[in-house]
Amino acid sequence: MVKPRIVSKRVKSVLIIGSIGVLVLIIAYVSLLGNNSAPTTISRYPSASLVANSKQDAVKKYQLQFCGTDSKTNANEYVQEYKLPQHCEMPLAVYAEGNGNNIWYISTKNGALGAFDSKSGNFEKEKLIPIWKSRSEPIDSSQVWDMKSDKNGDLWFTDEKQNAIWRYFKSSQKFEMYKVPENSSSFGTTYPVSVDFDNNGNVYFVGIRSPALWIGNLSKLRNGTSEGLSKIPIPVSGFRGIEPDLISTGSLALDKKNGVIWISMLAFNTKGQIIRYDLKDKNFKTYDMPPELSSPVGIAIDNESNPWITDHGTSLFFKLDHSTGNITKYSTSKASARIFGSNSSSAPQGAYTLPYWIKSDSNGILWFNEHTGNKIAKFDPATQTLTEYWIPTQDNRWGQCIDPRVPCGIANALQFSVGQGNNNVWFSEWSENKIGMINASRASPISVSAFPAELTLRRGQSTDIKVQVKAVSDTEVNMLSSSSLTRNGDLGNSTGSFSQDKFNLKAGDSKEVSYIFTASSNLKPGQYVLMVGADTSPLTVLKAIRINII
């Protein structure tokens, strides 16, 4: 992970992505000097600098990096990708409407609203958003992180560079823009990032650069103005001592049943808070996160009104119990060696998957994207089962490749939407000029069970966990484990090993293996979660086991 370098006052940030705030995971700087002979440097996560000696070269390199000029559509058993109709769309927000047949997306480069008919496989003619400054800038875009539909079926989306939120009326095919009535003196925008609605249809949103909850009164909103917008300052006293420019608002989610708004706040990799706002009492309640959860971003509400949050500085996601304030941490599988082009069975030490945004489907299943894990995951709170879908695209321009001759990198699947009819998941590939679909109704090739589901150990004590894998179809199985013991899913000083790491199963067969876990002698007493399961290459299935250390 890298921090932005301040190159000069004439250097403009054209990409702020990955982590929320000034500390980011992917940064690109492009010099916009008038002198063509002046060098231009583009630095990005994770490694190399691209040097251009002319504006023409700068544009070419920018397009190669961010426009998916040479990308191809890929597929596996669960994922199908679709190339967008225009050049260099740089899609972020995507929205699966109603039953998931009509898929909306925003071109952050071209400033256009597009739609894809998943039944016919055809793209509709894109609709230009009236005001979009980056459309005329060859190396710029305006990030649109969120798009949702209101109760009337109209689309709302956030807009970074115009410092606004937009509404698209489908009946009249007209756009309206509502300007945020303030901006950041350091960044020139509040950077609207997340939007939601209450039961009355009023709109609520937050901006990365604004510690405030913004409210839009539908009856008072006026196109092209700030009328009807008001704000409620979010208390940030808990971030005292941290430079204000490093304090960011992550996202918000409404618990409509209880009239509560949940908001994530962070100083990336320094401090995290989850904030509860009661719409009736107009009171804030703040929950300080432990040090290992210092980058909370995405929030979704489960069927029991508990917020689930993704931490975009680790490989962890977690539940905050709304009644007790207790936190239960879970880990994704550890980062795949495939991301690094490694022939070994494990990724380099310290690799993170960076869970980003999280959403719930009509069955109460939680979905989230693993930014640098190159997966879309779903977690069933009822069965404590995590299923991860591998995205078949890898771009080595976005990877720390050990061997560039081997496929490596990630697809930059930065946002997604869950179709409420069929629960298929649609996601955008921001640097690849594509959208993709996960067929969530297709059966997994394996099922995993583990016993016991919860256990209590003393430090230094070992236990034998039985893990059973049953095959629905012929498959090769690789056993996996991870945990909430560390930020990246490793076991830390604890150890764990399977009696057999790899085997083949025929359809209908099952196999039980032992997993011997030994808690380290210096492990801090408390509750942890161990994830055990299997990988089949396109799909991973893990079961969560609670471990109480006494």
Residue ranges and their predicted role:
Residues 442-550:
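Long beta-sheet-rich domains in secretory-pathway and surface-associated proteins
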Residues 112-115, 164-167, 211-217, 272-275, ...:
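A short loop-to-beta-strand structural motif that recurs across blades of beta-propeller domains
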Residues 117-121, 169-173, 217-224, 277-282, ...:
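Short loop/turn segments that connect beta-strands within beta-propeller blades
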Residues 87-99, 132-151, 183-199, 237-257, ...:
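Beta-rich, blade/repeat-based domains predominating
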Residues 404-445:
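Blade-level signature of beta-propeller repeat domains, shared across WD40, Kelch, NHL, RCC1
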Residues 50-63, 80-111:
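Beta-strand-rich domains and repeat architectures in extracellular enzymes and scaffolds
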Residues 103-110, 140, 157-161, 203-210, ...:
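Conserved beta-strand positions in repeat-built beta-propeller and related beta-rich domains
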Residues 62-64, 80-83, 124-131, 176-182, ...:
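Beta-propeller fold detector
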